[in-house]
Swiss-Prot record:
Keywords: Chloroplast, Membrane, Photosynthesis, Photosystem II, Plastid, Reaction center, Thylakoid, Transmembrane, Transmembrane helix. GO terms for cellular component: chloroplast thylakoid membrane; photosystem II reaction center. It comes from the Eukaryota. GO terms for biological process: photosynthesis. It is a single-pass membrane protein. One of the components of the core complex of photosystem II (PSII). PSII is a light-driven water:plastoquinone oxidoreductase that uses light energy to abstract electrons from H(2)O, generating O(2) and a proton gradient subsequently used for ATP formation. It consists of a core antenna complex that captures photons, and an electron transfer chain that converts photonic excitation into a charge separation. This subunit is found at the monomer-monomer interface and is required for correct PSII assembly and/or dimerization. The chain crosses the membrane at residues 17-37. This is Photosystem II reaction center protein L. Belongs to the PsbL family. InterPro entries: PSII_PsbL, PSII_PsbL_sf. PSII is composed of 1 copy each of membrane proteins PsbA, PsbB, PsbC, PsbD, PsbE, PsbF, PsbH, PsbI, PsbJ, PsbK, PsbL, PsbM, PsbT, PsbX, PsbY, PsbZ, Psb30/Ycf12, at least 3 peripheral proteins of the oxygen-evolving complex and a large number of cofactors. It forms dimeric complexes. The gene is psbL. It is found in: Plastid, Chloroplast thylakoid membrane. It holds the Pfam family PsbL.
Amino acid sequence: MARPNPNKQVVELNRTSLYWGLLLIFVLAVLFSSYIFN
């Protein structure tokens, strides 16, 4: 059973893209708030 499970790879890919999306939203929120408060 050395064959990797494709289902697990899909889950890890979705989790990574979710983290990138959250990071992008966080950066945009910080830039937007600094633009507003200046």
